[in-house]
A protein has these predicted regions:
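Nucleotide/pyrophosphate-binding catalytic subdomain
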Residues: 1-194
Length: 194
């Protein structure tokens, strides 16, 4: 049976209840072995997408303002999912790394990508799949353009021995390892290349 790649957007992964629906869809068909996940989207009218909150953190840090209040809101969004699904995932080291990044040398693409990164870790834990960082497989040229040849090679080498995986959408890595994002909606691109 050929593996199927499925991609779920932000509204599909905004809450624990949505995670449960996504898991049911994936478990319906054993061929659905690879999942590309977005950052949590809006939970209700008037809510803010996690990616937009991450951009606010970046903007605050660059303006010399304290990003902690917005980062606390992001942390709580993920904690709500962890608690409701009873996951034994500790995202605190990830948030510590994000805070350090904001203090030292904020990079917009790195910040924007953390929603996909963290949500994919949670979804992988919930499904019992392996988490594979997109920065290991989705590659860009030095000029920031997508490198399909290097990406296809990296995906082949990485996923050949992994039965089931969750991969964050929206970003990959530059030749120097720096995180680089696609434009908004780039998780769809990740889904198509995986």
């Amino acid at each position: 049976m050929n593996p199927i790649v499925v991609k779920f957007g932000g509204s599909s992964l905004a809450t624990a209840a949505q995670f449960e629906k996504v898991a049911a869809i994936i478990r319906e068909n054993p061929a659905r072995r690879y999942v590309v996940a977005s950052a949590p989207g809006k939970r209700f009218d008037g809510d803010t997408k996690v990616t937009d909150l991450l951009y606010r953190c970046y903007d605050a840090a660059c303006a010399g303002q304290d990003p902690a209040p917005v980062l606390s809101e992001i942390r709580q969004r993920f904690a709500d999912i962890v608690d409701a699904l009873h996951l034994s995932v500790d995202l605190e080291p990830d948030f510590t790394a994000i805070e350090a990044h904001l203090r030292q040398s904020p990079q917009r693409d790195y910040m924007a990508s953390r929603g996909e990164y963290l949500n994919s870790k949670l979804l992988a834990a919930y499904l019992g799949f392996r988490f594979v960082d997109a920065a290991q497989m989705v590659l860009f040229h030095a000029d920031g353009s997508f490198d399909p040849d290097a990406t296809n090679t990296a995906i082949g080498h990485t996923l050949v021995s992994i039965e089931r995986a969750v991969v964050p959408g929206f970003y990959g890595a530059m030749p120097d390892g720096a995180v680089h994002t696609f434009t908004r909606g780039g998780s769809d691109v990740t889904g198509s290349v995986v």
